[in-house]
Amino acid sequence: MAEHGAHITTASVADDQPSIFEVVAQDSLMTAVRPALQHVVKVLAESNPAHYGFFWRWFDEIFTLLDFLLQQHYLSRTSASFSEHFYGLKRIVAGSSPQLQRPASAGLPKEHLWKSAMFLVLLPYLKVKLEKLASTLREEDEYSIHPPSSHWKRFYRVFLAAYPFVTMTWEGWFLTQQLRYILGKAEHHSPLLKLAGVRLGRLTAQDIQAMEHRLVEASAMQEPVRSIGKKIKSALKKAVGGVALSLSTGLSVGVFFLQFLDWWYSSENQETIKSLTALPTPPPPVHLDYNSDSPLLPKMKTVCPLCRKARVNDTVLATSGYVFCYRCVFNYVRSHQACPITGYPTEVQHLIKLYSPEN
């Protein structure tokens, strides 16, 4: 007991303070995850707008909701955000003595938890929305889309003029705080941590053991739930925990994949890439009829390949580029879900009507 007390009294607050490289790395982790997921959703939406267009249109809101579930899960169970926990860090209530510090497995107090969640989730969402608004207003102002009598025109001009200075001030504030942190003049590398009333520290062996012990206890303790309200609350809690755990596992794998891509495209690996990609270009594929009764292309370009008559209401298939009569190709695609010539999978939304000057 005496040795434990001596260790506590001699330990300084800065003993567990992470380096600038650790805190910058964990800051950049979620910053890299967002555009990566956004690109994946964009590719899916472009390939199948009917199924994935919703996720592209509401990506910011869906990402913010999932990010909130993930961060709330980690803040309440590990006293850290996902990226902080990934790098072995935790949040400590500022000003608390080592004797009164909560274990990381107990989570943050409610006040500090909600402040941290707001700065981790809500603030980036608002920042993204402001950036999109500024980009849209610049384009509209450049092409003079706003009418001269618009009441909002003056507000748009003021916003566009002030936004770069606000952004510069914001980034300068963060840069100044990081410089003070490097020089040992501040215990927070980010002003948002100070506003949330917490600071970052390293996880100790006791913290890791306590979190592992809590997981074992949670899986072992399964109390019978009696009331319907408690059943619903327990089910929601398990669902949120399951979603957060799935996101955590997926992001961990995704982070590894991003680091692999970073290594793959690094300058040191360029010679390896060139040796692997320096292969002859394969010849273009020879298109074969996808079945025996596939119609042959007519010799005259104005004839529909399906009805063998002059085309009416020219319609092109976006999947293959061939032109048909609208009624012919509409009925065919609706029945077979494929291009009549190539057999490529095709849906009705891939029909594009052509309006030529002759018509």
From Swiss-Prot:
Chief site of localization: membrane
What functional role does this protein have? Component of a retrotranslocation channel required for peroxisome organization by mediating export of the PEX5 receptor from peroxisomes to the cytosol, thereby promoting PEX5 recycling. The retrotranslocation channel is composed of PEX2, PEX10 and PEX12; each subunit contributing transmembrane segments that coassemble into an open channel that specifically allows the passage of PEX5 through the peroxisomal membrane. PEX12 also regulates PEX5 recycling by activating the E3 ubiquitin-protein ligase activity of PEX10.
**Pathway annotation from the record:** Protein modification; protein ubiquitination
CDD domains membership: mRING_PEX12 (cd16451)
* Transmembrane spans: 20-47, 52-76, 110-139, 145-183, 250-277
Domain note for this entry?
The three subunits of the retrotranslocation channel (PEX2, PEX10 and PEX12) coassemble in the membrane into a channel with an open 10 Angstrom pore. The RING-type zinc-fingers that catalyze PEX5 receptor ubiquitination are positioned above the pore on the cytosolic side of the complex.
Location in the cell reads: Peroxisome membrane
Tell me the residue ranges located in the Peroxisomal matrix compartment per UniProt. 1-19, 77-109, 184-249
Which Cys residues form disulphide pairs?
none
Q: Which organism is it from?
A: Rattus norvegicus
Q: What is this protein called?
A: Peroxisome assembly protein 12
GO terms, molecular function:
ubiquitin ligase activator activity; ubiquitin-protein transferase activity; zinc ion binding
Is Membrane among this UniProt entry's keywords? yes
One Pfam family recorded for the sequence: Pex2_Pex12
